[in-house]
């Protein structure tokens, strides 16, 4: 509270926040995190100034699996791209090929373009706002519309050359809003079903409220799972492992 800003007689002290990690520079000793302003303590982050001390705990959760010698499709919506570009870079460093669908609501939302390009062999830039993004690399494509529509257009060869076919994909990782990930999960069994090979792994990063950040303590992050084959209903602590099977 000593360093917290004050407004009239109110101390604007922040509670603990669950943050999105973006990147790490080990040589310079830097950690980049992203705060999503959603009211309360997260809004106070905008009052921080360069040089203010910050206490970080973590990382919590589990590392995302980044196997080598596979073909992986990354599907990122908005803030999810801040996480996916580091995952994509790790996958490529391990020897995997990466097809990246990066989706945004508006043209002003895109950031870290160089990092996303470094995380992918091919990027499909998706934007709800026309005229869409101009690709920087010859192998990349652009699409005006939502990310599932972009995937359908790509799979149907409506975006030109298909550099990495869907049926080559061993793994799909989706990070974004609940609605976006649900739409991707539904499309895999609907309009895109014939384009994916049997047995591919599909992972979604669970969005849930966080509180203790100590793994399986407070149960604030409990999420319901329903097995699509048996109908069995279970719960998981998403703070322990944020990456779960997309179909559950």
Predicted regions and their residues:
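Generic structural signal for buried aliphatic residues
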Residues: 1-3, 53-56, 221
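Ferredoxin-reductase
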Residues: 1-50
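Short, charged beta-turn/beta-strand-edge "cap" motif at the junction between a beta-strand
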Residues: 2-7, 58-63, 228
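Short, solvent-exposed loop/turn segments that connect beta-strands within catalytic domains
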Residues: 9-12, 28-29, 196-197, 228-233
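Short glycine/proline-enriched turns and hinge-like loops at secondary-structure junctions
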Residues: 12-14, 66-68, 215-216, 231-233
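FNR/FR-type flavoprotein reductase catalytic core
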Residues: 40-211
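Local cysteine-cluster metal-coordination motifs and their immediate loop/turn environment
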Residues: 83, 178-179, 208-244
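Extracellular/mature segments of secreted proteins
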Residues: 247-248
